[in-house]
């Protein structure tokens, strides 16, 4: 017998709700119900020809109040990369912000699947840039920068809603960017990994910040909002989705048992649970922000408009919190930390984390 002893896990830490990512959260009960219901229904056609996938696609059309094309993929990187590839040729370019997920966190996926379309980073400057947003002027500056054939021709504008800094484009801000895009014959892609949080924050109809505002394709996130896996790629301009199913298959994103990706969406779309979950996550972020605002020496970095809170902490405080088992990301150099709340984040978890930060700051 080995004399090696496996350490007993600290269950308090192991089961603690964390603030690193909304991906840490599990599946909400309603999504789980439909997952298991689909499983209990027995055999069903494969590769998306099942009634579950058709039913959810119709429900999404009802949600957006338009006849859109809907596809399901496993994750957000695939959704963004394949959607952009459908809008671009290899000699085209995509205009985005310096902090866009497609620029910083998708391992070159958009470029790979488009056979080389270049990402053009546009710095809006001022408050917009500080809040992770594009502006109409920033888009036009990039379009007019060069027009010769030695430069990748701008073809798409990509907006992230909510942004990577936890801010939200207003309806008018979206319209301003899309109007400029249309002026220069550009298509508009929306990375909506946290689209639900943006809609809940704005308290608007989902169509008002998508197709009615000039967005051509939306990558609608579900994984961060209570689903087990899967994002929906929604083409409001259906002509742009021609042959998209081939792209999905080629990229290894066509689930043979598609119903297990699509069916859980029913739990989200019925009774607007997708907005309730997102609204709760947003509210928990506001609660955390309110706690942190009272801590001497702690700086809050950007407005909290969705489910993220950004704060500046001394490195000694960061290290102490991490040693205590708290998990969060350092996204900004010099102690800028991101704290994410999820659909299941409890008030008790928020209060405990805030208390830990306050204690660490007091001793710093």
Go through each PLM region and give its residues.
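Conserved PLP-enzyme active-site core in the AAT-like
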Residues: 2-324, 330-345, 353-363
């Amino acid at each position: 017998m080995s004399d090696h002893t496996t350490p007993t896990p600290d269950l308090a830490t192991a089961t603690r709700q964390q603030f690193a990512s909304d991906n840490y959260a599990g599946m909400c009960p309603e999504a789980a119900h439909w997952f298991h219901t689909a499983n209990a229904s027995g055999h069903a056609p494969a590769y998306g020809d099942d009634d579950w996938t058709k039913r959810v696609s119709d429900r999404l059309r009802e949600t957006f109040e338009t006849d859109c094309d809907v596809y399901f993929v496993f994750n957000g990187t695939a959704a963004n990369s394949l959607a952009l590839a459908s809008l671009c040729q290899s000699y085209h370019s995509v205009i985005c912000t310096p902090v866009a997920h497609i620029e910083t966190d998708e391992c070159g996926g958009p470029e790979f699947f488009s056979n080389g379309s270049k990402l053009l980073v546009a710095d809006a400057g001022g408050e917009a840039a500080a809040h992770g947003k594009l502006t109409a002027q920033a888009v036009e500056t990039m379009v007019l920068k060069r027009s010769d054939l030695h430069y990748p021709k701008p073809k798409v504008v990509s907006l992230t809603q909510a942004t990577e800094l936890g801010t939200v484009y207003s309806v008018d801000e979206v319209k301003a960017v899309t109007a400029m895009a249309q002026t220069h014959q550009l298509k508009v892609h929306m990375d909506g990994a946290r689209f639900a949080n943006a809609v809940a924050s704005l308290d608007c109809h989902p169509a008002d910040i998508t197709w009615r505002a000039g967005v051509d394709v939306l990558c609608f996130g579900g994984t961060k909002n209570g689903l087990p896996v899967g994002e929906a790629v929604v083409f409001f301009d259906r002509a742009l989705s021609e042959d998209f199913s081939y792209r999905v298959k080629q990229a290894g994103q066509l689930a043979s048992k598609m119903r297990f990706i699509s069916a859980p969406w029913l739990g989200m779309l019925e009774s607007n649970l997708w907005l309730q979950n997102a609204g709760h996550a947003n509210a928990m972020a506001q609660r955390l922000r309110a706690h942190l605002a009272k801590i001497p020496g702690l700086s809050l970095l950007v407005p909290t408009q969705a489910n993220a809170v950004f704060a500046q902490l001394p490195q000694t405080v960061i290290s102490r919190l991490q040693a205590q088992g708290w998990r969060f990301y350092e996204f900004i150099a010099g102690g800028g930390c991101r704290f994410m709340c999820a659909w299941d984040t409890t008030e008790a978890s928020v209060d405990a984390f805030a208390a830990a930060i306050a204690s660490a700051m007091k001793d710093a």
